[in-house]
Design a protein with these regions (language model features):
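N-terminal helical capping/dimerization or prosegment-like subdomains
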Residues: 11-107
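Generic secondary-structure signature for well-ordered alpha-helical cores
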Residues: 25, 36, 62-63, 148-151, ...
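Midchain, well-structured core segments that form catalytic/ion-binding scaffolds
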Residues: 172, 180-249
Length: 249
């Protein structure tokens, strides 16, 4: 990206490791404080929890060094916006994440409370520990490190939504309404995966979602198969053919 200055990789690795070691207990507690909030977007009874989680993210973003952070309304669950300004001419990175999680049911399959983080063999078990409170926390702490150590060379914006797990029904309208606020040079998505635990991966693209309702209409009365079979298309056969051809081989 034009205008970005990169620091020495070996120095950064040592410095980051030291920062993590010095702040590990705090990092974990802040992460766990988010996990403990049952921000299940598919459950309409969790509206209060959704707002509480958004407010918690706002607080953590300000603590990490954002110039401003706010919880913004939408037609559904609120979104969290924050930014750190370095310079008018500096490139801007927009970091996307989501604070909502999937339902934890069936609860009898869990060995521990899904909303009370439990560490077993060096791994954290809880709903949202990974998707997406874990990845978003990594981005937040990387941002915090860059700010506090004086390494930040570009403007940073955060946007966290609360409906990703239900298809982001309110996101498009929000983006259109606030397109100037969210203007950026590049977007970093905090909701991807690694090929293996010891193999960090750079994801350059994700598949989206698309929904259709298809209606196939045929004759308005029963037709004798001996007279019309094969000559008049059966709506079921037509629909099967359509579905089979929707995949691009």
């Amino acid at each position: 990206m034009q205008g970005v200055k990169f620091l020495n990789g070996k120095y950064m690795a040592k410095s980051v490791k030291k920062y993590i070691e010095e702040n590990e207990a705090r990092f974990l507690e802040e992460w766990f404080s988010l996990i403990r909030i049952p921000s299940v977007s598919a459950d309409p009874t969790r509206k209060t929890d959704m707002v509480a989680c958004a407010e918690r993210w706002k607080h953590l973003l300000l603590e990490a060094g954002a110039d401003e952070a706010r919880v913004m309304p939408s037609s559904g669950n609120p979104l969290v916006y924050a930014e750190k300004r370095v310079g008018f001419d500096a490139p801007t990175v927009l970091i996307y994440g989501h604070y909502d999680v999937m339902p934890a049911e069936p609860l009898d399959l869990w060995k521990s409370d899904p909303f009370e983080p439990e560490v077993r063999d060096g791994h954290v078990f809880a709903r949202g520990a990974d998707d997406d409170k874990g990845q978003s926390m990594i981005q937040l702490k990387a941002f915090e490190y860059m700010v506090r150590e004086g390494h930040l060379r570009h403007n940073v914006k955060f946007i966290l939504e609360g409906e990703e797990e239900i298809g982001s029904p309110s996101l498009n309208a929000f983006l259109q309404e606030h397109r100037e606020l969210l203007a950026c040079d590049v977007i970093l998505v905090s909701d991807t995966s690694m090929l293996a635990p010891d193999l960090p991966s750079l994801t350059t693209g994700l598949r989206g979602l698309a929904y259709w309702e298809i209606e196939v209409t045929g004759p308005n009365r029963d037709l004798h198969s001996g007279h019309f079979g094969g000559a008049v298309a059966n709506p079921i056969n037509v629909l099967c053919s359509l579905l089979a051809r929707m995949t691009d081989e």
